[in-house]
Amino acid sequence: EIHERLVGSEMCIRDRLQDFTYIAHHYLPAARKRLTALLQNPPKDTASVAPELRPALLYREQLLASPVNEQNAMVRALSGGTVFPAPGGDPVLNPNVLPTGRNMYSINAENTPNPRAWEDGKRLAEATLKQYISKHGEYPRKVSYTFWAGEFINTEGATLAQVFWMLGVEPVRDAQGRVVDLKLVPSEELGRPRINVLVQVSGQLRDIAGSRLKLLTDAIRLTSEAGDETYPNYVASGTLLQEKLLVEKGTSPKRAREMSVMRVFGPVNSGYSTGMMAYTEHSGSWESEKEIAEGYLNNMGASYGDDENWGDVQEGLFASALSETDVVIQPRQSNTWGPISLDHVYEFTGGLSLTVKTVTSKEPDAYMADYRNRTNRRMQDAKEAIAVETRSTILNPTFIQERMKGGEGSAQMFGEIFRNIFGWHVMRPSAMDKELFNDLYRMYIKDENKLGIHEYFLRVNPAAFQAMTAVMLESARKGYWKASDEQLKTTASLHAQITREKGAACTEFVCDNDKLQSFVADQLDNSEKQTYTQNMKEVHEASATDGKDVVLKEHKLTSEQTVRKNRVNGVVAGSLVVITFIGLVVLLKKRKKNK
């Protein structure tokens, strides 16, 4: 509506409307006020409500009905009744998931990419190439993608379509719309080189879309053998290079040729994680980012391309497949998370970027494939995406004030974002604003906006604040934050104060990093240093004595309450099991008597 009203004006363009910060500062307050008033006092007659606002009333009713629907559906399921199906997903993106309390389904993987997803994927692939060419003046040789189950389901295969179009193949469908084969797009029709690809998958995606990963390997074989090309075929040349690198690593020529078309990789041992988040945050245990990359190669090096080699780990294969990578791409389809609020983004795409840089000695470009706006899919530079989320959330006083209305969980969210920021600095420091830590220092350590930051965290969740200060100090120790002596002293003093007054919450940063503890102590004056050192010594001794994690003072009561609550829940659950068992016995006896 706003776009149509301002068409032809420099005040507003479609891409700018998609920028969250622009909407937040110019239109969101008024829209929120109008919607809030409507939802708090809904009229009995909706005819007086503007047509564009009527869906909000429907969604309100469906949300209010959802808890009862969920309870009724559970009882109906336990009674052997039918739980009716409905799509699952983000209600912001797809309101059809409301009301909840129905049997969620995702998609039929065999139909992917569906026709709409195919067109979306083609557009995003071309947008990727256009963006890369505008910066580098040439086509990329290889693009490496991250595939997640959520994005695959929500876009109905648009992520897969991007890869197919990069290769220059298109789907062949049967009468039921299933994608059963692929065919080459002629080189003249494609009008550009065939771009080589690599795909890393999450465990969930591997489990629900195994047939699509095998189809992708078929696409690699098909394009590697394409002849009479008008334009370069980077897939074919990449396959030959991969074979050559494997032979150089000691693989037999026959095996090297067989594995040269493998481009799909994921967690080893049929796992579900890169395993790199904990290692990254245990930063006292590694000195160089190359150690992180080596761990990534080991943990994500299982191939998932065909039945014969499903889950196999071939030494040197993943590294050889990463060669020549010019771009890494992360899908994004939800408004509920961003690159700094979800740790899996730095874990997967950040980890992939670092590993490519380690293998090729060149950092690839990094983009987000943004599916959030169904009418305007777009590619966004990772640095821009991080900056937008950073400025609109963790450095936004209004956002911070709203989050501070919450309790322990809200405070914990800040700590998680700080850890993710550290993770990005480890994996891809070029994506981070050089002034970010200084901005965080002014916002949280100095509280220059007078938000009551210290009072809030010390009251609600001192462990989160302790972790935040520890992350900043570890970032300085590692060289990611070029802090001044004053900044270091102030941050270390605050960290020591929390430890002195509240105890030490033994997270990876606070208790498990002896090098950081020495670094913190070196920033303190003699009296603070002595007290801090003694506090940490007592924590380690206590942990060694009882073998249990140390909890902050304010959290002990919560833990006891949790234990009591769990006991009550256990009694209730046990009673339900007994009652159910008795009921089954009675039912069986009745059936036996009737026979």
What residue ranges belong to the model's regions?
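Ligand/cofactor-recognition surfaces for anionic moieties
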Residues: 9-595
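Single conserved hydrophobic/aromatic residue that forms the stacking wall/gate
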Residues: 1-8
